Amino acid sequence: MLQLTSSQLNAVAAFKAFLDGAAQVFVLRGAAGTGKTTLVAEFLRYLAALNRESVLMAPTGRAAYIIAQKTRHAASTIHRAIYSLKVIKSASGADGADTGLHAQFALRSNDDRRNTVYFVDEASMVSDKFNENEAFSFGSGRLLSDLFSYADGRKIVFVGDHAQLPPVDMNFSPALDEDYFRTTFGCTVTGCTLREVMRQSDGSVMLANATRLRQSIEDADYAEFTLASGTDTKRADAGLLDPYYALSADKPCPTAAIITYSNRQALEYNIAVRRYYFGADAPRLLAGDMLMVARNNYAYGHELFNGNIVLVKACENDVMVHNVNVKLDKERSVCVPLRFRKVTIAYRNAEGPVTLDVILLDNFLDDPHGAIDSLTARALRVDFEKRLPSKIKDALPSIRKAITHKAPLTHDQQEIYADYIRLLLHDPFYNALIAKYGYAMTCHKAQGGEWENVFVDMFRYGGTANENYFRWAYTALTRASGRLWHFRSPDYTYISRMTVEPIQRSGNICTSIYAAPGSDFRKARFERIEALASRASLTATDDLSKDYQHRVAFTDADGHRASYILWYKAKGYSDRVQPVSCDSDELRALADTVVADSLAPADVPFACPERPFAEKLAAHIKAILAELDIRLLDITHEHYQDVFHVQASGLAKIGLYYNDKGIYTYMKLASSLGADDAKLEAFRQKFE
């Protein structure tokens, strides 16, 4: 029997309440290893037992295939589920440029039962930002909005990991954001967040690393990045390629993927992998090559989605070259050579294995960019229009003009335009497969997929102590289902980049003394003096009538008296203690000890919830101070600085400076004794 964690049981109860309640949206969030997919399968079985229909979707073909395999429930892409290929509008460019006609595809008619429940897996990838390419767009161009329009009030369950990368060109994941649902769609939202790691995931170093990154993202604290190693996680100090090659001697391993930060890095790895397996003089494409689809394609009877990995079963050596003149404006044009190749590919989708004969755009195989540029896209359209029948070709200028000016098309124009779209949708060259080598890819391309063996090159130009990088790293590391190798990963703690300066002498240190909020530090010190004096069988009185002089007098049981002046400033005491009078050596010794010991309060609290690593460092410093018998007097906060006021061999200050990311950059130390402060020097050496 399936053993559910307590948070999973809570989610099951919340889901059942959702089915009976008024809310339209249920958001199931959870990090890697918390059992989201297990719950989705449980929810689907529960709905089936109720004889209630469910539809399972994912943003990409690979994600749909994975969730279908894991839940044993049919799944499709969101696009396939909600859109038809019926053209509902068109548009055209202006200014004499070859921008072409634009087709928009409508939402399907929804005939599902009103109590149908839709499930969207990998919801962190679902965008609500307007999106279209040179020739096509779907619905309104906003996928999440179109999904709500299609659902038409039916219930939707969004499932995802809120720590993963958001959709491209968005800085958050709208499909996991309850406030976004409420404000944008005006719907009632409920949900649950899974936090417990499932029992079978215990002991996974890979998962432990991901959990630490997720916690940093949730805390918005990026001051520490380090990855532990273990049986399922290895640091590849010499590079990723040797362990990658070790998986398979004679051909690329289909259960492995290399993930990089940039497209250019991915290209370099792809070239290296091909050189190793196929030789330095190998043709650009061979049977056995793996390709990654870089643009959605609907022309071959089966969807090919951005990010799909396909295997080349056969390919022709001959390349067809179409030289295309593309107008840039009314006066300028440029020749764009398009190279095409016939290829047979195989891959798996949610329904099973698929084999297709396609035309491949050979230009893009080793392109260092993530998508074809607008000039190439326009060249594909111009190349298509060169092959049109003269009747359609002659009518295009007037059709473009009418569309540009939003004028209605005549009956003849409508028929010609319908023929144009029909031919465009089935033209093998216009609909050439846009793909590149598929051994290495960026994290955005890998998102939604998983591999048994994942190799992550974690280098990026620019900083790593930020939310974007942590989300990227978390998403990349969680693509592995079995083993992970990482290379060039950051390794820093909140203090590892801190420069520790030599001790400076300060002849006029005024040390802050902690006092509870609302109290006077002078009165707080005298309370400590009274308590210490009482333990030594002394009585104490004080006089604060003179500015900056705290006069304290002690009397013993024999009537002997000793008096002192403790000098202070606005924020605390200096190291100047002036004995005024004493008529007993024994009393003098006791009083000196009381005065010295009274400087340090019993405890100095430190709270900084907005900087969790500051609290961690404060605890670390307190432990070192106690070990070295250095008394902590106060901790104050100044501009980008935490200051620890201490009584070491002399009075001293330890200044810890941090940057706007919460990372400590350097430590400044000052003492009334300078470098001769032995205790403070011992403290300093702890950080070297």
Q: Where do the model's predicted regions map?
A:
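Catalytic phosphate/metal-binding cores of nucleic-acid and nucleotide-processing enzymes, i.e., regions
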Residues: 5, 61-62, 300, 436
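Short, conserved phosphate/pyrophosphate- and ester-handling motifs at nucleotide-, phospho-/glycolipid
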Residues: 8, 60, 262, 448
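N-terminal accessory interaction module
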Residues: 330-331, 528-599, 619-687
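Conserved helicase motor core of P-loop NTPases
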Residues: 11-19, 23-24, 142-145, 149-154, ...
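C-terminal accessory regions
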Residues: 329-338, 343-527, 531-534, 554-561, ...
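ASCE P-loop NTPase helicase motor core
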Residues: 13, 17-18, 24-221
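N-terminal pre-Walker A segment at the start of P-loop NTPase domains
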Residues: 1-13
